Amino acid sequence: EEALQSGNVDAIAATSMRKTNNERIVDKFDSSDFYVIVKKGNTELLNEINYAIDQMNAVEGDWKTTLYNKNYESIQTKNLEYTEKEKSIISQYSKDNPLHVLCDPTRYPYSYNENGEMKGIIPDYFRKIADYAGISYEFLTPATRDEYIAYQKNKETTDISIDARLETDNYAETKKWGITAPFITMQLARVTRRDFDGKINVVTTVDQTASNSIEDAMAPGAEKLMCSTRQEMMEAVRKGKADAAFVYYYMAQAFVNSDTTGTMTYTLLEQPTFTYRMVVSSTENHALAGILTKAMYAMPQNLVEDLAARYTTYK
């Protein structure tokens, strides 16, 4: 650090857990987990600590980021500057050559197609970071999930998919994709009627292609009622055709808060969770993923929650 401040070196690699002074962050990379260590055999204390962390995860929101921002974040760490090379890449996406953007039209309120316009939490979030970076873009407008999947397979049409759930980073490498940092972690919720007795005999689903679906894990042995969309899944529960539906949290919240019958409720589940990234096509410059990631770091801490409130608040 002294060498950097004195000008003896041009750049250093350092931990993010430090205050910055007269520095410019060029890039962030890699991460390491921190652990609480107890004396070997002290399982009682270990269980208490794990329980406390679970409770914080359940009720304190993104407390890790809150603590980090309180102790380490500064204007310099939040506003990452683009290099000359990155600025050159950004300039390639003009109004005459916009970035073609894809997202699923069947995941209200996360993303949906309304009269030929892509709306929802994820499209709104992308607009924020693309505008911050100065990238011109144009949303593709699939009306159905089948059209969405067809767009996914068409490299000539789709430049970036903004709602990718990847099992591993290695999978992206095999596809020669560029990937951003995660920008949203989705939790599941169980949607039921208020008179639910706790036993799931029939569960709704939209996907039986996976050998081990969410419904298999959450309601083993239950009969599956196939639906076309997740909205239909929750409607089937409201009509008494099924006992439960498992959907992403904001889907459940929006559905229940807009329900005028007062018969529906949802329960937030701690596990499993699903992390989403944006995926740059193999035909585009992968540096674009880093450009968008820098824009993500510059966004307000609670941006996703604030965007979600527009769609999920009781009206």
Regions found by a protein language model. Name each.
Residues E1-E2, T313-K315:
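Short, intrinsically disordered, charge-balanced linker/junction segments flanking boundaries
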Residues D62, E138, E223-K224, T261-T265, ...:
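Secondary-structure boundary/capping residues
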Residues D30-E84, G120-Y132, R194-D216, Y249-Q253, ...:
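Extended ligand-binding regions for polar small-molecule ligands
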Residues Q231-K241, F246-Y250, F255-T261, T265-E270, ...:
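Intrinsic low-complexity, intrinsically disordered coil/linker regions enriched in small/polar
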Residues V36, L67-N71, R107-Y112, M118-I121, ...:
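Broad hydrophobic/π-residue packing in well-ordered secondary structure
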Residues E1-K40, Y108, P123, R127, ...:
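Acidic, polar ligand-binding/catalytic clefts
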Residues E1-D10, I49, E60-T66, K87-D169, ...:
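Extracytoplasmic small-molecule ligand-binding "clamshell" domains
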